[in-house]
Amino acid sequence: MPSFDTVCEASMVDVKHAVENTTKEITTRFDFKGTPAAIELKDKEITLTGDADFQLSQIEDILRNKLTKRSVDVRFLDKGEVQKIGGDKVKQVIKVRNGIETELAKKIQRLIKDSKIKVQAAIQESKLRVTGAKRDDLQAAMALIKKDITEVPLSFDNFRD
């Protein structure tokens, strides 16, 4: 029975390279000289450190540009709150989304059921598997998901015929 998986995964290699390129640019830019401006990637969290909110926004802008150049959708980034870490330094943690949240998976599942396309959607941990009898039905389901779900960057993997 034909099937495909709907996933929400960023290429962590490209994210790592974008963070490294951002670090290089921070060290060479004149307006960041002598400041504690830094960016760091640990697991799936990017930590921005700087003197003020304005500096954090500049670092984030550089990061977004580098991610865009590497074809990583910036909707993968989930910004946290700006925290004061002593003195006049601030930091912000940005999480890189990986996997479809349960709430979104249920929304997609409901969307597919309501569309009356002859496919079934099953939630499997951080992805959503869609199965159907015909390949055309699966392609219609893909088109429906792409059209209606725009808040997160979804991709389709593991298409089996």
UniProtKB/Swiss-Prot annotation:
Q: Which SUPFAM superfamilies match?
A: YajQ-like
Any Pfam family hit: DUF520
Q: Does the keyword Membrane belong to this entry?
A: no
- Molecular function as annotated in GO: nucleotide binding
Q: Which GO terms describe its cellular component?
A: cytosol
**Where does the record place a coiled coil?**
none
Record-linked InterPro entries: DUF520 (IPR007551), UPF0234_N (IPR035570), YajQ-like_sf (IPR036183)
Going by the UniProt record, its keywords in alphabetical order are: Nucleotide-binding
Answer yes or no on keyword Chaperone.
no
Q: What does this protein do?
A: Nucleotide-binding protein.
The family assignment reads: Belongs to the YajQ family.
Q: What is this protein called?
A: Nucleotide-binding protein Rfer_2692
> From which organism does this entry originate?
Albidiferax ferrireducens (strain ATCC BAA-621 / DSM 15236 / T118) (Rhodoferax ferrireducens)
Write the lineage as a comma-separated list: Bacteria, Pseudomonadati, Pseudomonadota, Betaproteobacteria, Burkholderiales
